[in-house]
């Protein structure tokens, strides 16, 4: 799957530099962000968003985990599941990322997407418990792509899950964790969306 978004966005090279810096600290996050970015761009195109909207979501995909730069190594790089205190720290990364980006007027809309990318359609996400269309569309798209990549990728504490299992999890959470329209588009275009994992 090739994403056409990056060629026309004036900040794309700068964003890739930031992602590379994060990649040097946590190799998983860098490659993860690249895959999420490409999937989010693809879904934006399927939804018929404007070129500018799709580009914005593509860039937000690259930057959605930038807040992890503020998470201590003992938590970010831990080989194993996080305990309650560590998880509490990890859950701060959307706010840290949004705070970093909101310092520039160029990235204000991106900051809103990044702030909400762990919210859930049913309001049980974080950091604010926003629900439904209270969550920016870009964040709702990234939430689906982020989950797919988290499940389909090998982690320090587990192997990658089979794509059939990942698909079943998305299906199970349509209208619960995920925006129904976004999730259904992902499911209807599953093979194309997940070709990078095959």
Question: What name fits each language-model region?
Answer:
Residues 3-198:
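Metal-dependent catalytic cores of enzymes that make or break cyclic nucleotides
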